[in-house]
């Protein structure tokens, strides 16, 4: 099925310019959305919880900072950019009491709407604008006269103008310069979760850890194992990012290329594909999301335990030791502490 893509010429910027927009959250996406919207002539205020460390940054950027409830009462379009696990409480306690017919609530990820953890009043437009890039990239591209491709979707459309409103918002943050792709909350949510769990985070992380274990158990030095199964991953991913799998295979040695072709299917075989299908099924039927929120309600013992377990894997120690030799790496974690 062909996707439907929009550009600036398809958008009416005056629609979003006629709205009062509250951006809930001032993190990676929040600061980018707020600044780009303001530069596009939109009236914007920031909603934050009391005591938020982001409040000072938002004020320094020239925004009026309100509580989430005050922002929701003031606005007629509310973009919720708080973490998935925080959105439900924010919505129920601080946003929903102030919603009225004709208002709109927007999201950058569809999880809580798709799985009905958040249910908006029938008279409220529910839509999504999801840039396919981090906030700093969204902002930088915007200031350079470019844009980051974004997804839009509409879940509830009481006025019949939801798509036009979402497209106008997307254009105001620069997405129309690159392309705005129409999707659904279901498609965005389920594919996003699957990609994270089966490939980008869960799958890749375990692949590297298991490869490391195989080499070390076979008697190879942990440092060598780290280099071969983890450190060089960036080189490969950059090649794929720049030009696809074919570009990667063209750029590596013929030995690596041939080895990849003949051994890759031995690792990622039909059993792995069936396991991936099971992961997808548990996303689709809500099993994963229910388990995540059950853990959240209990104080996240599952997440915290797994986080500690993974952080203590021998691959992490080998990586820390080797990165200390690489002066060119700007490490986001303070590994000298």
Curated annotation (Swiss-Prot):
PROSITE patterns assigned: KARI_C, KARI_N
List of residues binding Mg(2+) 1: 192, 196
Residues binding substrate: 253
InterPro entries found in the cross-reference section: 6-PGluconate_DH-like_C_sf (IPR008927), KARI (IPR013023), KARI_C (IPR000506), KARI_N (IPR013116), KARI_prok (IPR014359), NAD(P)-bd_dom_sf (IPR036291)
Catalysis performed (reactions): (2R)-2,3-dihydroxy-3-methylbutanoate + NADP(+) = (2S)-2-acetolactate + NADPH + H(+); (2R,3R)-2,3-dihydroxy-3-methylpentanoate + NADP(+) = (S)-2-ethyl-2-hydroxy-3-oxobutanoate + NADPH + H(+)
SUPFAM superfamilies linked: 6-phosphogluconate dehydrogenase C-terminal domain-like (SSF48179), NAD(P)-binding Rossmann-fold domains (SSF51735)
UniProt GO cellular component terms: cytosol
Binding residues annotated for Mg(2+) 2, in chain numbering: 192, 228, 232
Active site: 109
Chain residues that bind NADP(+): 26-29, 49, 52, 54, 84-87, 135
Entry annotated with the keyword Aminoacyl-tRNA synthetase: no
Transmembrane segments: none
Residue ranges of domain KARI N-terminal Rossmann in the record: 3-183
Keyword Amino-acid biosynthesis found: yes
One BP annotation, GO: isoleucine biosynthetic process
Pfam family, one: KARI_N
Keywords attached to this entry: Amino-acid biosynthesis, Branched-chain amino acid biosynthesis, Magnesium, Metal-binding, NADP, Oxidoreductase
Entries under Gene3D superfamilies matching the protein: 6.10.240.10, NAD(P)-binding Rossmann-like Domain
Pathway membership, UniProt: Amino-acid biosynthesis; L-isoleucine biosynthesis; L-isoleucine from 2-oxobutanoate: step 2/4; Amino-acid biosynthesis; L-valine biosynthesis; L-valine from pyruvate: step 2/4
Record family assignment: Belongs to the ketol-acid reductoisomerase family.
HAMAP family: IlvC (MF_00435)
Protein name: Ketol-acid reductoisomerase (NADP(+))
Organism: Corynebacterium kroppenstedtii (strain DSM 44385 / JCM 11950 / CIP 105744 / CCUG 35717)
């Amino acid at each position: 099925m062909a996707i439907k893509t929009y550009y600036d010429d398809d958008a009416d910027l005056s629609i979003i310019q006629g709205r009062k927009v509250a951006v809930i959250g001032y993190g990676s996406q929040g600061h980018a959305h707020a600044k780009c919207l303001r530069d596009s002539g939109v009236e914007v205020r920031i909603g934050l919880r009391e005591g938020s460390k982001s409040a000072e940054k938002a004020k320094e950027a020239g925004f009026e900072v309100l509580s989430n409830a005050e922002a929701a009462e003031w606005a007629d379009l509310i973009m919720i950019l708080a973490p998935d696990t925080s959105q439900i409480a924010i919505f129920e306690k601080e946003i929903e009491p102030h919603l009225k017919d004709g208002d709109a609530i927007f999201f950058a990820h569809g999880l809580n709407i798709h799985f009905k953890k958040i249910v908006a009043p029938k008279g409220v437009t529910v839509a999504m604008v999801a840039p396919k890039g981090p906030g700093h990239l969204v902002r930088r591209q915007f200031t350079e006269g470019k844009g980051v491709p974004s997804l839009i979707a509409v879940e509830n459309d009481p006025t019949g103008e939801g798509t036009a409103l979402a497209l106008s918002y997307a254009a105001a943050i620069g997405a129309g310069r690159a392309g705005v792709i129409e999707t659904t909350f279901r498609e965005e949510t389920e594919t996003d979760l699957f990609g994270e769990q089966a490939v980008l985070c869960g799958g890749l992380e375990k692949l590297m850890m298991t490869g490391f274990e195989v080499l070390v158990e076979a008697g190879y030095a942990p440092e060598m194992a780290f280099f071969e199964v983890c450190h060089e991953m960036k080189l490969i991913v950059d090649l794929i990012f720049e030009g696809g799998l074919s570009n990667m295979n063209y750029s590596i040695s013929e030995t690596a290329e041939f080895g990849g072709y003949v051994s890759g299917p031995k690792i990622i075989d039909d059993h792995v594909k069936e396991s991936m299908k099971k992961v997808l099924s548990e996303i689709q039927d809500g099993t994963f999301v229910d388990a995540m929120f059950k853990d959240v309600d209990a104080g996240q013992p599952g997440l915290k335990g797994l986080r500690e377990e993974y952080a203590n894997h021998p691959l992490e120690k080998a990586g820390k030791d080797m990165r200390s030799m690489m002066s060119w790496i700007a490490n986001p974690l303070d590994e000298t502490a």
